[in-house]
Curated annotation (Swiss-Prot):
Compositional bias annotation for Polar residues: 439-461, 473-483
Organism: Mus musculus
Protein's name in the database: T-cell surface glycoprotein CD5
GO cellular component: external side of plasma membrane; plasma membrane
PROSITE patterns: SRCR_2
Alphabetical GO biological process terms: apoptotic signaling pathway; T cell costimulation
Observed effect of gene inactivation: Induced Cd5 deficiency compromises gut barrier integrity accompanied with reduced expression of several anti-bacterial peptides and mucus components in gut epithelial cells. The frequency of peripherally-induced regulatory T-cells is decreased while the propensity of T-cells to secrete IL-17A is increased due to a STAT3 activation.
Record topological domains on the Extracellular side: 25-371
Subunit: Interacts with CD72/LYB-2. Interacts with PTPN6/SHP-1. Interacts with CBL. Interacts with CD5L.
Result of altering residue 486 to F: Complete loss of LCK binding
Length: 494
């Protein structure tokens, strides 16, 4: 082998040795398993190495590390890269990370575990800790954000009343909601659309529209505390079209207004209604008309709105009486207080005006469906009359009965007495002498029309001598062959 070949072989060996040495230093301890513990991040914590299938902490005095944490950090770049973290920041002991576990002490080059020994529990050595930068999070490039649009409301439109005037039901400030957008409605005094008011009251199931309230009337008497809690929303709607037929057509959005006046309505079904009664008459259906406000009863003063019969007919129905009979005004004391209703009917009176001097009252008379019965004195008189009638019948009844029977028998005796056959032309007449004598002896019988009805009582002369003789003979010798009670043959012989 010549010198040239020897030189080439030596160069090759030196290159191989240099490559080996550079490879070892470049890997910088990547041949060991390292992890960081004791924190919530994988990029900071106590250094633990895997030896003998166990994870062990490393004493901070190992590998002759300096006290400068930042200088030591340069030697831990390979470890941070292996942990997929950023650049190293500090390497050394940290009092906050002091949890040794199977701790070892290593010598030699940094991150070499060829010369590591277990330490005793008596050795006071803080574990070695490492802090690396957190890995950078890769975020996708920003995309163009579409413009935000407010979706159209899907809930059906609705109305709501915030109680205002004296806390009455079906009265108050009107709020309109369309989806999630809600608010009160701007009210303009020049606009008084009756159709819109009826639509609002009908939608709220409160009957028909009565009136709008101005700001002063809407304030009125304050409502109870429990009803004043809900405050009306600000004005966000207006009603440009008063002749609309649906809620969505009636209202349109407007800018929020704090100083404007909100729409306030009173519907016919407001509650509670005015209570009324009639006092001072003979029954509950007659008397002076009185009304009640809260717990106070006062007379209802006469007003121009009550000139017709409508108010008083309604009052009669309210008292469960019949039809209205009459009504008239009655003078009252000048100091007598009362209430005044400005509406035509009491059912429309949402507010009663207090008056200190009620000069004219109204006396109303309604038909009483349940009139009073008979007085006790009248009933007693009727009973006494019936008792007397029964006693009278008991005393006089038999006498009257006897007289009636006797009169009936006398009528049966008034019959013709004379011949009944064809050839029997003989008749019996009272003699004139007997008749005159009987009238003289019995003057009371002269007025009798039928001279046969009452025979003479005090006369010794018979009025019918032939007849009496025949009767006497026939009674002694009865003849059954004759149909008559008188023996006519004997009478003919006489």
């Amino acid at each position: 082998m010549d010198s040239h070949e020897v030189l080439l072989a030596a160069t090759y060996l030196l290159g191989t040795l240099a490559a080996f040495c550079l490879g070892q230093s470049g890997r910088g301890g990547l041949d060991i398993q390292v992890m960081l513990s004791g924190s919530n991040s994988k990029c900071q914590g106590q250094v633990e190495i895997q030896m003998e299938n166990k994870w062990k902490t490393v004493c901070s005095s190992s590998w002759r590390l300096s006290q400068d944490h930042s200088k030591n950090a340069q030697q831990a770049s390979a470890v941070c890269k292996q942990l997929r973290c950023g650049d190293p920041l500090a390497l050394g002991p940290f009092p906050s990370l002091n949890r040794p576990q199977n701790q070892v002490f290593c010598q030699g080059s940094p991150w070499s575990i060829s010369n590591c020994n277990n330490t005793s529990s008596q050795d006071q050595c803080l574990p070695l800790s490492l802090i690396c930068l957190e890995p950078q999070r890769t975020t996708p490039p920003p995309t163009t954000t579409p413009p935000t649009t407010v979706p159209e409301p899907t809930a059906p439109p609705r109305l709501q009343l915030v109680p205002g005037h004296e806390g009455l039901r079906c009265t108050g400030v009107v709020e309109f909601y369309n989806g999630s957008w809600g608010g009160t409605i701007l009210y303009k005094a020049k606009d008084r659309p009756l159709g819109l008011g009826n639509l609002i009251c009908k939608s709220l199931q409160c009957g028909s529209f009565l009136t709008h309230l101005s700001g002063t009337e809407a304030a009125g008497t304050p409502a109870p505390a429990e009803l004043r809690d809900p405050r009306p929303l600000p004005i966000r709607w207006e009603a440009p079209n008063g002749s609309c037929v649906s809620l969505q057509q009636c209202f349109q959005k407007t800018t929020a207004q704090e100083g404007g006046q909100a729409l306030t309505v009173i519907c016919s079904d407001f509650q509670p209604k005015v209570q009324s009664r009639l006092v001072g008459g003979s029954s509950v259906c007659e008397g002076i008309a009185e009304v009640r406000q809260r717990s106070q009863w006062e007379a209802l003063c006469d007003s121009s709105a009550a000139r017709g019969r409508g108010r008083w007919e309604e009052l009669c129905r309210e008292q469960q009486c019949g039809d209205l009979i009459s009504f008239h005004t009655v003078d009252a004391d000048k100091t007598s207080p009362g209430f005044l209703c400005a509406q035509e009917k009491l059912s429309q009176c949402y507010h009663l005006q207090k008056k200190k001097h009620c000069n004219k009252r109204v006396f109303v008379t309604c038909q009483d469906p349940n009139p009073a019965g008979l007085a006790p004195g009248t009933v007693a008189s009727i009973i006494l009359t019936l008792v007397l009638l029964v006693v009278l019948l008991a005393m006089c009844g038999p006498l009257v009965y006897k007289k009636l029977v006797k009169k009936f028998r006398q009528k049966k005796q008034r019959q013709w007495i004379g011949p009944t056959g064809v050839n029997q032309n003989m008749s019996f007449h009272r003699s004139h002498t007997a008749t005159v004598r009987s009238q003289v002896e019995n003057p009371t019988a002269s007025h009798v029309d039928n001279e046969y009805s009452q025979p003479p009582r005090n006369s010794h002369l018979s009025a019918y001598p032939a007849l009496e003789g025949a009767l006497h003979r026939s009674s002694t010798q009865p003849d059954n062959s004759s149909d008559s009670d008188y023996d006519l043959q004997v009478a003919q012989r006489l």
